[in-house]
Regions:
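Lipolytic serine-hydrolase domain surface
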Residues: 2-129
Length: 129
């Protein structure tokens, strides 16, 4: 890819079990965020597996991206921030970490389809952090 050019791809995270700050510049996956045209991140505050995500590290108390959303969005450039959409799916998914709950949720699948397959159709813009 030539300098200044960026491959065009989109990312959707359902129930993301990743530290909620790892996508920020300078962090573990900090180079990923600028690479995608669109990001859709779901948040579920009732997900029992994500609520216990802190158990993955013995000496630290991380929070899952799928539980809290991306923290530190205020540290991103306006252009990066505009490509991120976060949606709260707590009322749709509830107290489960089961992938089927996402697959059989028409609103989630519909939004995922729009973001991944038809950019620009039904765009709501970046949700508030």
């Amino acid at each position: 890819v030539a300098p200044g050019e960026r491959p065009q791809f989109r990312v959707v995270f359902w129930a993301a079990a990743e530290h909620d700050y790892w996508l920020l510049p300078g962090r573990y996956h900090g180079q990923a965020l600028p690479m995608a045209d669109r990001w859709l991140i779901t948040r579920n505050y009732c997900d029992p597996a994500l609520a216990r995500y802190s158990w993955v590290e013995k000496c630290y108390d991380p929070t899952a991206l799928g539980y809290s959303g991306l923290v530190g969005r205020n540290l991103l450039t306006a252009e990066q921030n505009a490509r991120i959409e976060e949606i709260d799916v707590t009322d749709l998914i509830g107290k489960t970490h089961d992938n089927d709950a996402y697959l059989y949720s028409e609103p989630i699948v519909s939004r995922t389809r729009e973001v991944l397959l038809w950019p620009g159709i039904g765009e709501q813009g970046a949700a508030a952090p």
